[in-house]
């Protein structure tokens, strides 16, 4: 089979280090009857060992040449190939208890993580290879330089753990950044959740639009509607110092106060 040339427009960097593959599979710990979807299988570095351990795998691949290659390599009863951009795929269609894995294209990693939140009710867990700095932001605590809108939005929905780093030399071609692997498990139904997901998203986005400024100034006309003392948010606080629970409380309070521009559930 002829060699596949990595395509820059798809952000392709193929994992070639077998020890890293083994570490990822060990972290996933797949069981024979698990329902697993792999995003961006590429040259099957993870696909092969997964199929050694599970009965069936669904793979989402945007590159038509790689999709055709996968169909030639594996029988349809073992591997279902969905030839599509993962950003357009409704992952909820794959059923309950879903385990999502993959070496995500770094050029669309954040949009893809937000897209997958729409299927979180169906997901058991997610194991992804990503740019290390993205994972550092995902798991960052309030007050740290990495704490961001991404941190707040994902931590409101998932319990996340950074597992290990992966050097550029583990890939072909090697990326210009260090990668890492993260485990994401959706929080239970009884988690603290906002009254309106849309309002929560709007408030967090506005708060981090000028992260170095005091939150009171960034919120503008919403500031007068905010019960600062009740929320435990200091008058001089910046967005990067406010915890996830406080952001949920802030969004709920602004929604209840009729803050302009916030969508009701």
Swiss-Prot record:
This protein's GO CC annotations: cytosol
InterPro entries: KsgA/Erm, rRNA_Ade_diMease-like_C, rRNA_Ade_Mease_Trfase_CS, rRNA_Ade_methylase_Trfase_N, rRNA_adenine_dimethylase, SAM-dependent_MTases_sf
Residues that coordinate or bind S-adenosyl-L-methionine: 13, 15, 40, 61, 85, 103
SMART domains in UniProt: rADc (SM00650)
Reactions accelerated catalytically: adenosine(1518)/adenosine(1519) in 16S rRNA + 4 S-adenosyl-L-methionine = N(6)-dimethyladenosine(1518)/N(6)-dimethyladenosine(1519) in 16S rRNA + 4 S-adenosyl-L-homocysteine + 4 H(+)
GO MF term list: 16S rRNA (adenine(1518)-N(6)/adenine(1519)-N(6))-dimethyltransferase activity; RNA binding
Cellular localization per UniProt: Cytoplasm
PROSITE patterns given in the database record: RRNA_A_DIMETH (PS01131), SAM_RNA_A_N6_MT (PS51689)
Leading EC class: transferase
Main location, first listed in the record: cytoplasm
Keywords per UniProt: Cytoplasm, Methyltransferase, RNA-binding, rRNA processing, S-adenosyl-L-methionine, Transferase
Domain of life, source organism: Bacteria
EC number: 2.1.1.182
Reported function: Specifically dimethylates two adjacent adenosines (A1518 and A1519) in the loop of a conserved hairpin near the 3'-end of 16S rRNA in the 30S particle. May play a critical role in biogenesis of 30S subunits.
Family affiliation: Belongs to the class I-like SAM-binding methyltransferase superfamily. rRNA adenine N(6)-methyltransferase family. RsmA subfamily.
Protein's UniProt name: Ribosomal RNA small subunit methyltransferase A
Source organism of this protein record: Bordetella bronchiseptica (strain ATCC BAA-588 / NCTC 13252 / RB50) (Alcaligenes bronchisepticus)
Name of the coding gene: rsmA
